[in-house]
Amino acid sequence: SAAYIQEDDFETLKQTNTRLLENAVRAIEQIAPNLKSIILQTGGKGYGLEFPKEVGIADHIPLKESCPRIPEPYASKIFYYTQYDLLKQLSEGKSWTFSEVRPDGVVGFAPGTNAMNMAQGIAIYLAMYKEVHGAGATAPFPGHEHGYNSTHTDTFQDILSQMEIHAALNTDKCGNGGVFNVADGKVVTWAQVWPRLCERFDLVGGRPQSDATPMLEFVKNNKNAWVTLAKRHGLNEKLVYEQGWGHTNFMLVDFDFDRQYDLSRSREVGFTESIDTAESYFRAWERMQKAKMIPPFE
C-alpha cells in the first residue's frame, strides 16, 4: 500500500490514512482469497525525520530498522505506526502476512501530479534557471552549506518496487511484519549529486551562496520562463503551478542533517539491487521527457 491523502493536522492525517489502508485491506481480502502478502510502504517519518532535534536523530545514524519508535508526544503524529499496528491486527490468524518497506527520499516519475515528486521539481527548477540565466551559468545549490554536505540515501522508484516484490515473494524471510530499509546503495551528499544534475541542463552546479535568490522566490518570479519553455516544446504550461514546491524546498533546504539508512537487513534477506543516485535522476527525467513533462536535453 502506497496510497496517501494529505490533511492539515497530524490527527486527521493519521485517521484518514489508517482508514484508507483498512478499507483497502478488507476489500482485497474479499476478492483475493489466496492473498499471501501485503507490503506497507512507509518512509523516514518512522524514524522521526520531521522532528530531528526533538528525537535526537544524530544519535541514531545510520538509521536502522531496529531503532525504537520515537517517543511521545511525537509518536502520536506518525500514522505509519498505526498503519503497521493495523496490519499486525488484521493479519492475525490469516493466510497472509505483511512487510514494511522504508525508502528514503524517492526519486522517480509519476504520470500525474505528485506533490512529493522531488525529481520533477528539480528538473523544472533547473530548466527554468537555464532559460533565465542561459547555458553555462552557475546554479548554486538552493539549500544551506551544512545541507549540501549532509549524508542521505535516496531511493529510485525501480529499486523501491524491486525490494517490495522481493519482500512479497520471500515471506519466509521478510514476512511477519518484517521492516526493511531500501535505498539506491551508496550514501551520498548533494555536493556529490548536485553538480551532475546541473550538468544535464548545461549548467554548472555550485555550492550554496548566501546572496543567491531562494528557490521558491526564483520560481515565483520566473513562472513566465516555464510558460515559454512549455510553448516551445509542447509541454504543460500549468505544471509549474501544480508542482509541490513546498516539498521540493523541504528536501533541498530544510533536510540539512545526516539521515542515511543502514541497508544491512535488506542485504541479509538477499536483496542486492543498486544504482548510482545521479543516474536514477537521469532515468526519471528520461521518463518525464517521453511523457512531455520536461524539455529535452540539448
Q: How should these model regions be labeled?
A:
Residues 7, 44-57, 106-109:
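Conserved catalytic-site region of short-chain dehydrogenase/reductase
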Residues 19, 78, 154-155, 188, ...:
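Residue-level signal for the nucleotide or nucleotide-sugar donor/cofactor binding architecture
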Residues 26, 67-110:
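Active-site Tyr-X1-5-Lys
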Residues 160-249, 254, 258, 262-264, ...:
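Mid/C-terminal beta-alpha module of Rossmann-like enzyme folds, strongest
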